[in-house]
Regions:
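Register position in tetratricopeptide repeats
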Residues: 41, 83, 90, 130, ...
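Helix-start (N-cap) detector for alpha-helical repeat units in TPR-like alpha-solenoids
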Residues: 29, 63, 71, 78, ...
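Short coil turns that delineate tetratricopeptide repeat
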Residues: 60, 109, 156, 189-190, ...
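Canonical positions in the second alpha-helix
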Residues: 55, 104, 151, 184-185, ...
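N-terminal leader/linker segments that initiate helical-solenoid repeat arrays
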Residues: 2-4, 20-86, 90-91, 99, ...
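Canonical tetratricopeptide repeat
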Residues: 69, 73-76, 83, 120-123, ...
């Protein structure tokens, strides 16, 4: 009986020491947590992060008694990681920013903070796009494409990345690649911006065809450009090409919408004359009668047609 009583005393003593150790862990965890909260309020984010991480470790060591404090730490650590990542990005430390965002994603996912994980995931491709934009502004188009492709590796449905890739490829003379990128961007929330870019791509192609005396190519690309939006140059190039092809209905339709100048008026006059509409031809020849280059020819036409 004495031996049994001695065993109980020893057992109770062990429990007291064990419980006391838990209490000490929780007390220290609470103190560290409060210090971390103070650091955070003072803008010392790195000190705050280290403090909350230590408080979490101590709270978990305290077992069930520290469960609530551990939950509090898990709720704030991913958010601090995102905040530090943003600060790194603002300081142009892009690698450091991405590392913090990825750490935030891992912790937030592990601890069930879907909102913070989602925010961090959205920020990573934005970092690559920002870097790409800097290179684009410096006319380092190939290097910029590399950064935009990194953004797509993180977010395959990033319409802005496709839009910027298209802009870079257009500058590099890769019209086919630019068109493919812009068409993809159109399906991913960048329709208006992508259409503006496609207008320019096809106008550029049409102008190159016109200079190369490929009138059919110039007309086709000008019309393709106009499928995406209005452009005065597309009307002028397409109309000029149509005159060369003797497609006078197309010429009149396009040139009537082009910005008026001597060449546009001349080609409209020719087109109406070819269609047998002397009155309209005369109207446009009169508009260029005073032109230094076309005036004498126009005056002769006016004399012949305007009776």
């Amino acid at each position: 009986m004495k031996r049994f009583s001695k065993f109980l005393i020893m057992a109770f003593a062990s429990l007291f020491v064990f419980a006391n150790a838990y209490a000490q862990d929780l007390g220290e965890a609470t103190e560290v947590y409060n210090n971390a909260a103070t650091a955070l309020s003072e803008g010392n984010d790195n000190d705050a992060l280290a403090g909350f991480q230590k408080a979490l470790s101590l709270a978990e060591a305290a077992g069930e008694a520290g469960a609530q404090l551990a939950t509090e730490c898990k709720g704030i650590i991913p958010k601090i990681l995102v905040k530090i990542g943003k600060e790194a990005a603002n300081a142009k430390d892009l690698d450091g920013a991405i590392a913090k965002f990825k750490e935030a994603i891992a912790k937030a996912t592990e601890w069930g903070d879907a909102e913070t994980a989602s925010e961090a995931k959205e920020l990573i491709p934005l970092i690559f796009i920002t870097d790409g934009n800097q290179l684009l502004n410096e006319k380092k188009f190939a290097e910029a494409i590399v950064e935009y492709e990194k953004a797509l590796a993180e977010d395959p449905d990033n319409g802005m990345a496709y839009l910027r890739i298209g802009m870079c490829k257009n500058q590099l003379g890769d019209a086919a690649g630019a068109i493919a990128a812009f068409e993809k961007a159109m399906t991913l929330g960048q329709e208006a911006n992508a259409k503006k870019q496609l207008v320019n791509v096809y106008v550029k192609k049409a102008n190159a065809d016109l200079r190369a005396k490929n009138s059919q190519g110039a007309l086709d690309n000008a019309k393709k450009s106009l499928e995406y939006g209005e452009n005065p140059n597309a009307y002028m190039i397409g109309g000029t090409a149509a005159v060369a092809l003797k497609k006078y209905d197309d010429a009149i339709e396009l040139l009537s919408k082009a910005k008026a100048n001597a060449n546009v008026n001349y080609n409209l006059a020719r087109s109406y004359e070819a269609k047998g509409n002397s009155a309209k031809a005369c109207e446009y020849y009169k508009l260029i009668a005073a032109d230094a280059k076309l005036g004498e020819f126009a005056k002769a036409k006016v004399a012949a047609l305007c009776k």
